[in-house]
C-alpha cells in the first residue's frame, strides 16, 4: 500500500508503483515513473521524465531530474533521468537530466550508491554497482563502467570514460580516461596499479593473475597502444581484452603511469 504524506506534492500523471512511500514536502513531477517499494524521503524532488527502479531510496533534499546546467539547453527538449533498481541516493545529491547532445537522458544502472552532495551532470552514463563517495562530481557525458568506485571530493572532467572495475582515490581529479580494473590517484590523476582489492572480490586467483600480468605488460615499458595490440593476439581472457580495446579506443588519452612496485 502506498504511503503519501499529506504535504507531499504528486503531480497528476505521475506513475507510482506498489508500496511507494513519499514523505513530507517531497515533490514528484507529472512525467515521473516510480517503481515498486521506492522510498522518497522528506523534501526530495523528482523532476522531468525521470524513472526510478524498484527498491530504491531517495534521501532528503536530493534533486533528481532538474534541467541540465548547459547554456545550450532548450527547456522544450524532452529530457530526464533513468535509474535502475536498488539505488541509494543520499542527501543533497543532484542528478541532472540529459540533453539533445546525448539521447536526452542521464542513465544510471542497478545498485547505485550515491552518497551525500554528489553531482551527476547531464548525459552521464553510469553502469551497475557504482559507488560515488561524498562530493564526487561528474561533469557532462562522463561514463563509468560497472563496479567503479569514485572516492570523495573527486571531480571528473566532461566526456571522460572510466572503465569497468576501477577505483578512483579520494580527492583526485580526472581529465583523461582510466583503463578498466585500474586504480587511479592524484590531481591530475595517474594510473597507479591494478585495482587488486576490486578484482579479488570479483574474480578467482587465476583471473587476477592474468590481469596483473596484463597490467605489467601494458604499462611497464614501451608504447601503450602497441602493447595493447600485441597483447590482444591470441588473448583468451575477456577482461584483458576489455583493457586492450579500451586503450585502443580512448578519445581523451590515458594518463601517465606512476606505479607502485606491487602493481
UniProtKB/Swiss-Prot annotation:
The keyword Cell division does not apply. Keywords: Acyltransferase, Cytoplasm, Lipid A biosynthesis, Lipid biosynthesis, Lipid metabolism, Repeat, Transferase. It comes from the Bacteria. GO terms for molecular function: acyl-[acyl-carrier-protein]-UDP-N-acetylglucosamine O-acyltransferase activity. One of its GO terms (cellular component) is membrane. It is an enzyme of class 2 (transferase). Pathway: Glycolipid biosynthesis; lipid IV(A) biosynthesis; lipid IV(A) from (3R)-3-hydroxytetradecanoyl-[acyl-carrier-protein] and UDP-N-acetyl-alpha-D-glucosamine: step 1/6. Its EC number is 2.3.1.129. Pfam families: Acetyltransf_11, Hexapep. This is Acyl-[acyl-carrier-protein]--UDP-N-acetylglucosamine O-acyltransferase.
Amino acid at each position: 500500500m502506498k504511503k503519501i504524506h499529506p504535504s507531499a506534492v504528486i503531480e497528476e500523471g505521475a506513475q507510482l508503483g506498489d508500496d511507494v512511500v513519499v514523505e513530507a514536502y517531497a515533490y514528484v513531477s507529472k512525467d515521473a515513473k516510480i517503481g515498486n517499494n521506492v522510498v522518497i524521503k522528506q523534501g526530495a524532488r523528482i523532476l522531468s521524465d525521470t524513472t526510478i527502479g524498484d527498491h530504491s531510496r531517495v534521501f532528503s533534499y536530493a534533486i533528481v531530474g532538474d534541467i541540465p546546467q548547459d547554456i545550450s539547453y532548450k527547456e522544450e527538449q524532452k529530457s530526464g533521468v533513468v535509474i535502475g533498481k536498488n539505488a541509494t541516493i543520499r542527501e543533497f545529491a543532484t542528478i541532472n537530466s540529459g540533453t539533445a547532445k546525448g539521447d536526452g537522458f542521464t542513465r544510471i544502472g542497478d545498485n547505485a550508491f550515491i552518497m551525500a552532495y554528489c553531482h551527476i551532470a547531464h548525459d552521464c552514463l553510469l553502469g551497475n554497482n557504482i559507488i560515488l563517495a561524498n562530493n564526487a562530481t561528474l561533469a557532462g557525458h562522463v561514463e563509468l563502467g560497472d563496479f567503479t568506485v569514485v572516492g570523495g571530493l573527486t571531480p571528473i572532467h566532461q566526456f571522460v570514460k572510466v572503465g569497468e572495475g576501477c577505483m578512483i582515490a579520494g580527492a583526485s581529479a580526472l581529465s583523461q580516461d582510466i583503463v578498466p580494473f585500474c586504480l587511479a590517484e592524484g590531481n591530475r590523476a595517474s594510473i597507479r596499479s591494478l585495482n587488486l582489492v576490486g578484482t579479488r572480490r570479483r574474480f578467482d586467483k587465476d583471473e587476477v593473475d592474468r590481469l596483473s600480468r596484463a597490467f605489467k605488460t601494458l604499462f611497464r615499458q614501451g608504447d601503450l597502444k602497441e602493447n595493447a595490440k600485441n597483447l590482444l593476439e591470441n588473448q583468451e581472457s575477456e577482461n584483458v581484452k576489455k583493457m586492450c580495446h579500451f586503450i585502443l579506443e580512448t578519445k581523451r588519452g590515458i594518463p601517465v603511469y606512476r606505479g607502485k612496485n606491487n602493481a
